[in-house]
Amino acid sequence: MTSAADRVPAPLLVLAGIVSVQFGGALAATLVPVIGAGGSVVLRLLFASALLLVFVRPRWRGHSRRAWLTVIAFGVALGLMNFTFYSSLAHLPIGVAVTIEFIGPLSLAAALSRRWLDAVAVAAAAAGVVLISEALSTPFADLEKTGIALALLAGAFWAAYIVLAGRTGGEFPKLEGLALA
């Protein structure tokens, strides 16, 4: 049985993914003051899950215990990444929060680097993130430590999300793992 996602050209899926992530993030950020970070994340993930379940129609049976543990960990990392990031926004300017959050995936990239050129690319990415953010114009003493801790946690969950996304992709065909997460 083919899913709706199987019949859509890949570039269109990528474009739809980009639009949905950006729109969902913007909408969720505007909801944070009204329903809190937790409520915003729950609504965002429930909506995304419903769409994925409809369009991907994943198989629920026939997966190993290891596959289920992987997809559950992936979903938890995704939820906690979003929750800690949105929570950090109550304490930090968005540019600073994003800059701190990027420490997670950049640290992962640095840890997985095998060549000096990889390390140069990680350093260039880190410099670029800092330069386009508000991080350099915001004195460290003015930053709330709670916000810093939450943004660092969001970065750690982002790194875990990256690792678990790869493992989930190895355990489930196509988008099934993401839909089940």
Listing of model-derived features with the role each one plays in the protein:
Residues M1-G17, S49-A73, R114-V120, P139-L143, ...:
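Membrane-interface interhelical linkers
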Residues G36-A37, P93, P173-K174:
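A helix-boundary/kink motif common to multi-pass secondary transporters
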